């Protein structure tokens, strides 16, 4: 780095960022009230007050693994451990309803649909409510592509059925 000579003084990184032992001249030192930086004030002032500029403070986390408060459940408890986990999930309000029982007389298409999608059990009243709600939904004209306006619902259902059958007939790429 080249030094620039101004008035006999050299200007380099050591003059821009002086160390604490260097004596600053009256023209180079910080003036009163010019900023937050001062080489004489330690940064521990905020720690003494307990709060930073926005009222937040730094609290170091415990680094000692021996003093952890959380007890980890031993692995291999079997059924008792699973029940304990279920109790914790219910206590936290994260309980999900039990999955529907699988019946052996389901057709393959229904089983494939249930296994490929997450299923929400709905009673017939809820199904009708969803149908009525969706019937009232209308998309704006720019949101519907031209091909969708030109095909009837019956034709579209036929296209979807053929696509589903073709997907089931082809080998799965897993």
Curated annotation (Swiss-Prot):
Where is region (Disordered) located? 1-83, 95-123
One Gene Ontology term of the biological-process aspect is: spermatogenesis
Tell me which positions the record assigns to the signal sequence: none
Q: Name one GO cellular component term.
A: cytoplasm
Tissue spec: Highly expressed in testis. Transcripts can be found in primary and secondary spermatocytes, and spermatids, but the protein itself is only detected in spermatids. No expression in Leydig cells, spermatogonia, or sperm. Very weak expression in the heart, kidney, spleen, thymus and ovary.
Keywords, ordered alphabetically? Developmental protein, Differentiation, Phosphoprotein, Spermatogenesis
Residue spans of biased composition, Acidic residues class: 38-48, 65-82, 101-110
Per the record, the coiled-coil ranges are none
Q: Which residues carry this modification: Phosphoserine?
A: 103
Which InterPro entries does this entry report, sorted A to Z? MEA1
Query: What is the protein's known function?
Result: May play an important role in spermatogenesis and/or testis development.
Q: What is this protein called?
A: Male-enhanced antigen 1
Instruction: Name the species this protein comes from.
Output: Mus musculus
């Amino acid at each position: 780095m080249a030094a620039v000579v101004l008035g006999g003084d050299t200007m380099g990184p050591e003059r821009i960022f002086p160390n604490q032992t260097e004596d600053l001249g009256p023209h180079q030192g910080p003036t009163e009230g010019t900023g937050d930086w001062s080489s004489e004030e330690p940064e521990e002032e905020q720690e003494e007050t307990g709060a930073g500029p926005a009222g937040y403070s730094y609290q170091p986390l415990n680094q000692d693994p021996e003093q952890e408060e959380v007890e980890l459940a031993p692995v291999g408890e079997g059924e008792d451990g699973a029940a304990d986990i279920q109790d914790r999930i219910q206590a936290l309000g994260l309980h999900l309803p039990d999955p529907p029982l699988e019946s052996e007389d389901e057709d393959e298409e229904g089983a494939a649909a249930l296994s490929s999608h997450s299923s929400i059990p709905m009673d017939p009243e809820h199904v009708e409510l969803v149908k009525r709600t969706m019937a009232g939904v209308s998309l704006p004209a720019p949101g519907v592509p031209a091909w969708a306006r030109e095909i009837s619902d019956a034709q579209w259902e036929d296209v979807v059925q053929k696509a589903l059958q073709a997907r089931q007939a082809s080998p799965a790429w897993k």
